Amino acid sequence: MNIYLAKIDDEEKIAPLIAQFRVELKQLKGITSKPKIDLAKEEFREYLEAKYPVLVVEKDNELLGYLVCRIDGSVVWAESIFVSESARRSGIASKLYQEAENIARGLGGTTVFNWVHPNNDKIINFLAKRGYNVLNLIEIRKPWENEVFTQKISVGNHKYNY
């Protein structure tokens, strides 16, 4: 297993992973969709153009997972992390996250920051096992046109549509 920074030559191999990540992310909001490889390729190119470190795990010439970091000064954000279904529960996400934490330490930081959907139990549990248990910020916005909410989320004394 090899972990390295992705380059443009990895576009064909990483695009299906990015596309599937987007499908699974939409499922958290109850939206059914299909993988869109062309959009995934475009997203990958945008990451590279923005100089976001894209960490990938490769085994036997197949990409099994990736983590996109956004660096803002000395702060590292995990923009997205995804491991192919067949490779899950094998430590790949932990290895990717360790690399992101190494980037943060190299910049003088002590943590990687994360935006997560409040019903994304998989990533919340994963992060909790790594010691990430502090709620920092919440994103609050106006509803989109025709948006359907499936639940209410409580944060402190406040309730929000989700």
Locate the predicted segments by residue.
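Conserved GNAT-fold acetyl-CoA-binding loop/helix
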Residues: 2, 22-43
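A short helix-loop-beta-strand connector motif used in the catalytic cores of GNAT acetyltransferases and
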Residues: 42-56, 77
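Conserved beta-strand in the GNAT
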Residues: 56, 62-70, 77-82
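Glycine-rich acetyl-CoA-binding "A-motif" of GNAT/NAT acetyltransferases
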Residues: 62-65, 122, 134
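Conserved acetyl-CoA-binding loop-helix of GNAT-fold acetyltransferases
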Residues: 83, 89-102, 125, 129
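Conserved beta-strand-loop-alpha-helix junction that forms the acyl-donor binding cleft
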Residues: 114-123, 145
